[in-house]
Amino acid sequence: MHRQLRYAVLATALFASTAFAAARQELDTFTRGLKGLDGQFSQRVTDANGKVKENSSGRVALATPRQFRWEYAKPYRQLIVADGKKVWVFDPDLEQVTVRAQGSEEQNSPLVALINPALLDKKYDVSEEAAPRDGLQWLSLTPKVDTDASFQMASLGFGKDGLAKMEVVDAVGQRTTISFSGWKRNPAFAADTFRYTPAQGVDVVGDAH
């Protein structure tokens, strides 16, 4: 191997290792002692050709072990609540809520790495992007073959305030990019943050019991 080529290979390997260490360190620092998160998000969905299908924004809350709340405010309201046993999807405009058992689909979400980082290497093949992108250090997660995941690949981008961005590519090439801001660590959640009780007049679809 030529000296220049050998140097290039070694330099690339060293840089990639450093980038991975930096990104993994960002994850470890962000998740240390983490029991819950509350923040704002903006989301963009594009098809396999890069055409924008939807822009949305709202609030997200996560808590160990399996609770989450996605509260979409724009362009239309929608509420998704997981209480650890069931997932409720409420559409105010339709006055309808759909409820189903909470299963592996949620447990295999990339965000599981935040509130249960011990599952990261168990569920995913973890790699790094060799150089920062958008000013962030990135970890790429590819579901292992025996993992019942609903996506092909996901990436977590970390900045000075922790997780700043998440990208998810599904089976048909659709890409969802979520930017996070205003994270509050281990907040005192209201008692009903991860509970949903249908109001009178709301049509319930599914098994609520």
From Swiss-Prot:
Does tRNA processing show up as a keyword for this record? no
Q: Print the keywords alphabetically.
A: Chaperone, Periplasm, Protein transport, Signal, Transport
Q: Does the keyword Ligase apply?
A: no
Q: Chief subcellular site? A: periplasm
Write down the InterPro entries for this protein, in alphabetical order: LolA/LolB/LppX (IPR029046), OM_lipoprot_carrier_LolA-like (IPR004564), OM_lipoprot_carrier_LolA_Pbac (IPR018323)
Q: Give the range the annotation lists for the signal sequence.
A: 1-21
- State how it assembles: Monomer.
Report the HAMAP family cross-referenced here. LolA
According to its UniProt entry, the function of this protein is described as: Participates in the translocation of lipoproteins from the inner membrane to the outer membrane. Only forms a complex with a lipoprotein if the residue after the N-terminal Cys is not an aspartate (The Asp acts as a targeting signal to indicate that the lipoprotein should stay in the inner membrane).
* Family recorded in the similarity comment: Belongs to the LolA family.
Put simply, this protein is called Outer-membrane lipoprotein carrier protein
- Protein source organism: Xanthomonas oryzae pv. oryzae (strain MAFF 311018)
